[in-house]
Each structure stands twice: as C-alpha cells, then as structure tokens.
Amino acid sequence: MSLLLFFISAIIFCIAIFLAGNRKFTIALMALFSLMHISFSIYAWMNRGVTELTYFSYNGPGLLMLFILSVLVIPVVYHGIIYNTKSDIKRFNIYHISLIALITFMSGAYIANNMTVLWIFAEATTLAVAALIYHDRTDVALEATWKYVFVCSVGIALAYLGILFLSFIYGKEDAANLS
C-alpha cells in the first residue's frame, strides 16, 4: 500500500508544483519529495521480499538501485535548484515536475517484477528525460530532445520485442520466469 501512496504523492507533488507560481513553494516540495523518496527506500528495505500491487517486488537488485537513487536525489535536487536560479518560474517548475516524474518512474522500474511493467516505466523515464532536455525551449534543445526520444524509444521497443519473442519460444509457462 505504501507504493501506491508513493506514486499518488508524486502525482500530487507534480500538480502542486504546476499550479504554484512560487519558487520557494517548489523548493519546499522538492525537499519534501527527496525525504519521501528516502523514506520509501527505507520502507522497501524493511519489507524485502514483499510484493505490492502484484507487479512490484522489493528484491535485492531493485533495492540496491533504489538506495543509490535515494542517495543521488538530494544532490540532484540541490543542483537543479542552483541550475535554474535565473530561469523564469514556468521553466523552473517544468524542470522540477520532470525531475519528480523521472525519479518516480526510475523507482518504479527498479522494483518492477514484470517485464511489461518494466518496459512501461523505462519508456516513461525516456519521456521524463525528454521534458528535462527541452525545459529551456530552445531550437538546440528541441533537436536534442527528438533525437533522444527517437533513439531511446527504438532501443526500448526492440528490447521489448526480444522479450516477446523469448516468451513465444519458451511458451506461456516459462514466460512468467522472464519477469
């Protein structure tokens, strides 16, 4: 149930930042999100081996990646605030909404126990990074964004196609073991 709360809280934070026209409010929400992510990682560690929402499990490799992400969240959020100091409030908020989305999607991908769910979250991270690349809205950023989305989406789609072929080769019983 805590995983669902984490996902819903991330959505609420994004909506609140979108509606906020205040830089200090956005900074406060980003600090709160960082603490929430660290708390979620601790919760996941305390519930090792538990499956939530059918498609997410707190296992060793996923927890390791989740903790690394939690360690990186604080300096990334701090740097994002410094990097966007001179940006207008709209760009400042778009950057931080995209950052929350990216961290949330990465967390979901790390703990996913189903290949389709993993693929969905991996593709979602691509879109969140695209928003981070294009938050300045320049011509160079637009070119970089569409190239990034094209290359990543094709690569992720081909990887998922390979997973589907493996599931057809090994049959339905062994397809569950691919997850």
Regions from the PLM with identified roles:
Residues I94-A101, F105-S179:
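Alpha-helical multi-pass transmembrane bundles of energy-transducing inner-membrane proteins
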Residues M1-S98:
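Transmembrane helix-loop-helix hairpins at membrane boundaries of multipass inner-membrane proteins
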